[in-house]
C-alpha cells in the first residue's frame, strides 16, 4: 500500500505474476491471428496505484486542538466579562451588543473544538459528531453575518439609536446561521471513531449545498463588502460599509471557503486533477485552511479587544465626567 510520503511500489515477483496472469488470460480468451497493440502493464499498474496524502490534522495534532480550545474559551470569557463590566467602558463601542455576540460565537466554537479533534478515542457517536459540526459551522456563519451587519449598519446598531433593531437582527442572523448548518449536520457522522463529513452519492445534494453556503458566507460576503466600499467611494455616494480591524476575521475563513469549494468540484468529477501531486496539494491546502479557521477562535477576542480599545480611547475624552469625579478634580485643583 505504501504510505503518505512514498507511493506504493510493486515487488518484482508481484510484477511478474501480474504479467503472467494477464498473458494467460489473454491467450485463453483469444485464439487466432488477430493482432492487438502492446500493453505496458507496468504503466497501467503505476497509474492505478492509490494516491496517498499526509494528513496534518491527525492524532499528533491533538495538542494543537486542545491548546486552541483552552485559549479560545479563556480569551472569549475575558472579552465578555469586559463587555458587561461598566468599569472598562466597552459598552461605548458602536454596536457593542453585536460585538458581544461575536465573542459568544467564538466561545461556542472553542467549546466544540475538542469534540471534532482526532486522537480522543473511538467512542464518539454520529449524533455527537453531527452536533459538533452544527455548532462549529453555525457559530462561524453567525459571526460572519454579524460582521457583515456591523460593517453595513455601524453606529445605527446602538441600543439607543433604533430600539429593537439589534434584537431583531440578532435573532434573524442566528436563525439563518442555524439553517445554513443543516446540510453539514445531516451529512456528517463518525467513521472509525473520528468525526468526519460523509461523502456519498446519496448525500451529494447536501454536500453541494454546504459548499455553496461556505463559498457565499466566507468568500463572497467579504468580497461584496469590499466591492460596495470601493464602488460607493468611487461614485461619491457616501462612505459605504464601515471598514475596521474586525474585517481581519475573514482572513481566517476565506481560504476554507475557497478550498472546500475546490474539493467538492474534484469529488464531483467536475474538476479533474491529472496528477497525484495535484491531489496531494489539494489535501494539504484543506488541512492548512482548516487549521487557520480553527485559529479564529483565539484571534476573534483579540480583534474585539483591539477594536474596543481604539473606540473607547477615541470616545472617552469627549464624554462629560460624572459629578463626583468633577468635584473631586476641582478639590485637587484648589489645593494645588
From Swiss-Prot:
Give residue ranges on the Cytoplasmic side: 85-95, 154-166, 229-244, 309-336
In the record, biological process GO terms are: chemokine-mediated signaling pathway; inflammatory response; regulation of chemokine production
**Keyword annotations:** Disulfide bond, Endosome, G-protein coupled receptor, Glycoprotein, Membrane, Receptor, Transducer, Transmembrane, Transmembrane helix
One CC-aspect GO term: early endosome
Q: Where does the UniProt annotation locate this protein?
A: Early endosome; Recycling endosome; Membrane
Q: Which cysteines are joined by disulfide bonds?
A: 51-276, 129-195
Glycosylated positions are 16, 27, 33
Which is one GO molecular function term here?
Answer: C-C chemokine binding
Q: How does it sit in the membrane?
A: Multi-pass membrane protein
Q: Which residues lie on this side of the membrane: Extracellular?
A: 1-63, 117-129, 188-207, 266-287
What protein family does this chain belong to? Belongs to the G-protein coupled receptor 1 family. Atypical chemokine receptor subfamily.
Which PANTHER family has this protein been placed in?
Answer: ATYPICAL CHEMOKINE RECEPTOR 1, DUFFY ANTIGEN/CHEMOKINE RECEPTOR
Its function, per the record, reads: Atypical chemokine receptor that controls chemokine levels and localization via high-affinity chemokine binding that is uncoupled from classic ligand-driven signal transduction cascades, resulting instead in chemokine sequestration, degradation, or transcytosis. Also known as interceptor (internalizing receptor) or chemokine-scavenging receptor or chemokine decoy receptor. Has a promiscuous chemokine-binding profile, interacting with inflammatory chemokines of both the CXC and the CC subfamilies but not with homeostatic chemokines.
Q: What is this protein called?
A: Atypical chemokine receptor 1
Species this chain originates from: Papio hamadryas
Amino acid at each position: 500500500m505504501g504510505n503518505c510520503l512514498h507511493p506504493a511500489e510493486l515487488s518484482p515477483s508481484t510484477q511478474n505474476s501480474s504479467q503472467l496472469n494477464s498473458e494467460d488470460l489473454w491467450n485463453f480468451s483469444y485464439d487466432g491471428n488477430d493482432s492487438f497493440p502492446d500493453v505496458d502493464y507496468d504503466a497501467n499498474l503505476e497509474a492505478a496505484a492509490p494516491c496517498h496524502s499526509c494528513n496534518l490534522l491527525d492524532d499528533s495534532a491533538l495538542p494543537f486542538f486542545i491548546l486552541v480550545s483552552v485559549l479560545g474559551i479563556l480569551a472569549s470569557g475575558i472579552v465578555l466579562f469586559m463587555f458587561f463590566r461598566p468599569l472598562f467602558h466597552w459598552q461605548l463601542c458602536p454596536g457593542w451588543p453585536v460585538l458581544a455576540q461575536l465573542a459568544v460565537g467564538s466561545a461556542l466554537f472553542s467549546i466544540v473544538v475538542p469534540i471534532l479533534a482526532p486522537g480522543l478515542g473511538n467512542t464518539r457517536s454520529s449524533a455527537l459528531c453531527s452536533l459538533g459540526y452544527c455548532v462549529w459551522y453555525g457559530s462561524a456563519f453567525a459571526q460572519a453575518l454579524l460582521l457583515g451587519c456591523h460593517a453595513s449598519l455601524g453606529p445605527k446598531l446602538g441600543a439607543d439609536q433604533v430600539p429593537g433593531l439589534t434584537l431583531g437582527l440578532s435573532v434573524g442572523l442566528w436563525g439563518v446561521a442555524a439553517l445554513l448548518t443543516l446540510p453539514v449536520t445531516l451529512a456528517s457522522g463518525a467513521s472509525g471513531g473520528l468525526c468526519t463529513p460523509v461523502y456519498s452519492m446519496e448525500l451529494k445534494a447536501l454536500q453541494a449545498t454546504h459548499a455553496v453556503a461556505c463559498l457565499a458566507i466566507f468568500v463572497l460576503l467579504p468580497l461584496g463588502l469590499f466591492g460596495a466600499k470601493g464602488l460607493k467611494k468611487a461614485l461619491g455616494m457616501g462612505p459605504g460599509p464601515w471598514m475596521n480591524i474586525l474585517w481581519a476575521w475573514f482572513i481566517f475563513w476565506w481560504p476554507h471557503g475557497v478550498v472546500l469549494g475546490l474539493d467538492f468540484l474534484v469529488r464531483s468529477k467536475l474538476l479533474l486533477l491529472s496528477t497525484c501531486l495535484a491531489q496531494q496539494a489539494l489535501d494539504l491546502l484543506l488541512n492548512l485552511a482548516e487549521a487557520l479557521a480553527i485559529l479564529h477562535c483565539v484571534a476573534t477576542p483579540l480583534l474585539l479587544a483591539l477594536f474596543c480599545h481604539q473606540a473607547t480611547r477615541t470616545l472617552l475624552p469627549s464624554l462629560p465626567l460624572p459629578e463626583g469625579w468633577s468635584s473631586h478634580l476641582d478639590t485637587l485643583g484648589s489645593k494645588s
